[in-house]
């Protein structure tokens, strides 16, 4: 977070007692309760889910507004800045572990589960099974008939390649914006930040079109065996992270337009940039392991 440099900045700012954590927890409770009930066929679950989501977002808006006000009023000194940096570092580390688990699941299914199911001792149980990846493709059934409908895989051309170019370009525009901010060129910073936000938005539209194509034209669904589940699990969670990152960059851009951040103090900008570059790296892994291999 940024802060104004003045003589009143405390060594370590201790905020006043806040109701925001408890209110946010209540919103998450409604959201998770509703999601669980909706999945299990309870009609009221969707109302609880959306009510909890709206509640949680409103609390986050108020919470972030308070934090921004404290920052811009000069309450955040070096210790607070350092704590934010370590917090963001550990948050991104947790995200590395999050995606690492999913990449490991993909590797395990391909390298261990399929060969084990295709071994000789299972030949009597599943005589038609073929240890190939993906487990079921059009014209080549590799699982017991009727369990999984045949489907086609999503190759790297052209939608995933277009999205790769979009994300890599957004990383470049974000870096240019960062350098401009470090040199005090606010106008250039804002221009390239808007370019980054737009590139992220276009990425999401392309991925939405990709999903429609995969589901409708390729018959690739969540129920399409382990290939379908890992495909949507990895690309879906990554798309969600792109959406969150895009919102972060949008809020940072709006704050820049309001005059927030200086070339000396702008960790709010840097934290969002770290997150966006992390999203870029994860996509490169997806592009190679999911679409190419």
Model regions: which residues?
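...captures the hydrophobic TM-helix bundle architecture rather than a specific catalytic motif
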Residues: 1-293
């Amino acid at each position: 977070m940024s802060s104004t440099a003045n003589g009143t900045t405390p060594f370590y700012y201790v905020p006043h007692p806040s109701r925001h954590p408890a209110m946010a927890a209540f919103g998450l409770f409604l959201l998770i309760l509703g999601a669980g009930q909706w999945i299990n066929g309870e009609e009221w679950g969707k109302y609880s889910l959306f009510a909890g989501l709206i509640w949680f977002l409103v609390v986050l808006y108020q919470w972030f507004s308070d934090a921004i006000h404290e920052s811009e009023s000069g309450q955040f000194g070096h210790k607070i800045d350092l704590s934010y940096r370590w917090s963001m570092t550990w948050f991104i580390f947790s995200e590395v572990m999050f995606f690492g688990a999913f990449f490991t699941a993909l590797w395990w299914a391909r390298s261990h589960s399929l060969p084990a199911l295709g071994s000789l001792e299972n030949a009597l149980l599943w005589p038609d099974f073929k240890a190939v990846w993906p487990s079921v493709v059009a014209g080549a059934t590799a699982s017991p008939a009727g369990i999984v409908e045949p489907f086609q895989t999503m190759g790297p051309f052209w939608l995933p390649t277009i999205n790769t170019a979009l994300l890599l370009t957004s990383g470049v525009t974000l870096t240019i914006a960062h350098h401009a901010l470090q040199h005090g060129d606010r106008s250039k910073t804002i221009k390239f930040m808007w370019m980054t936000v737009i590139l992220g938005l276009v990425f999401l539209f392309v991925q939405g079109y990709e999903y429609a194509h995969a589901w409708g034209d390729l018959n690739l669904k969540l129920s399409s065996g382990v290939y379908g589940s890992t495909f949507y699990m990895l690309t879906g969670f990554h798309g969600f992270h792109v959406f969150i990152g895009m919102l972060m960059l949008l809020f940072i851009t709006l704050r820049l337009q309001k005059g927030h951040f200086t070339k000396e103090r702008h960790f709010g900008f840097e934290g969002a940039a770290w997150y966006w570059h992390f999203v870029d790296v994860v996509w490169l892994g997806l592009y190679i392991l999911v679409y190419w291999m």
